[in-house]
Design a protein with these regions (language model features):
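A short aromatic-anchored loop/beta-hairpin motif
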Residues: 1-72, 76-140
Length: 140
């Protein structure tokens, strides 16, 4: 990626690059901690921002980028309302659905072990699901 973006003197570390989706796969997006801010940085919430462009890649390669980050190439897109409908019909309503959602966390987003991400997400989902069931039980 550094060679393709003509970034010189990268810091000696390996960075996993994720596939964000089939649209504009030549464009990179960096999800990162809010300790980094650039003109193209968009805050998502109090612990997560996104920045597009090569400037952040230059800073990451030079060791001056955000403390934690995740690089993705490309993105997915849905028609208006389509994603919401798919997620509403998701698990547990439809066990064959590919959608399970849970609250995002820095631990989940920035874990370096991709297999660990699944475990963290499913543990979080199960905890949230059980908590919701318990709240429902106590209010009925």
């Amino acid at each position: 990626l550094c060679r393709q973006a003509h970034i010189e003197h990268p810091v000696d570390h390996s960075v996993r690059i994720y596939y964000g989706g089939p649209i504009e796969t030549q464009i990179g997006y960096v999800l990162h901690t809010p300790d980094y801010n650039f003109s193209t940085t968009e805050p998502i919430n109090k612990w997560l921002s996104v920045t597009q462009g090569t400037d952040i890649l230059v800073d990451i390669a030079g060791g001056t980028g955000p403390m934690q980050f995740l690089i993705v190439l490309g993105y997915c897109s849905w028609a208006p309302g389509q994603l919401e409908l798919e997620m509403e019909a998701g698990w547990p309503r439809d066990p064959n659905s590919g959608w399970m959602s849970t609250e995002a966390s820095g631990r989940l987003m920035f874990s370096t072990d991709s297999f660990n991400k699944w475990e963290i997400a499913i543990d979080s989902y199960a905890t949230n699901y059980v908590d919701t069931l318990l709240k429902f039980e106590t209010h009925t």
